[in-house]
Amino acid sequence: MKAQELRNKSVEELNGELVNLLGEQFKLRMQAATGQLQQTHQLKQVRRSIAQVKTVLTEKAGE
């Protein structure tokens, strides 16, 4: 998701998105640990998405 799309969302929506991403990251990490994850680039994508959401939340907290 692009940063501008994230900035247009409310804080509640961003928190919901963050919870979803953290759950997805947990599932991917478990798959990687058991050797079931074929597309390892997904871990990087989810980690980056989490960072983007947290950044936008911090920006909104400063407003």
Curated annotation (Swiss-Prot):
One of its GO terms (molecular function) is structural constituent of ribosome. Pfam families: Ribosomal_L29 (PF00831). Keywords: Ribonucleoprotein, Ribosomal protein. Gene3D superfamilies: 1.10.287.310. It comes from the Bacteria. InterPro entries: Ribosomal_protein_uL29, Ribosomal_uL29, Ribosomal_uL29_CS, Ribosomal_uL29_sf. GO terms for biological process: translation. GO terms for cellular component: cytosolic large ribosomal subunit. Belongs to the universal ribosomal protein uL29 family. PANTHER family: 60S RIBOSOMAL PROTEIN L35/50S RIBOSOMAL PROTEIN L29, LARGE RIBOSOMAL SUBUNIT PROTEIN UL29C. This is Large ribosomal subunit protein uL29. It comes from Glaesserella parasuis serovar 5 (strain SH0165).
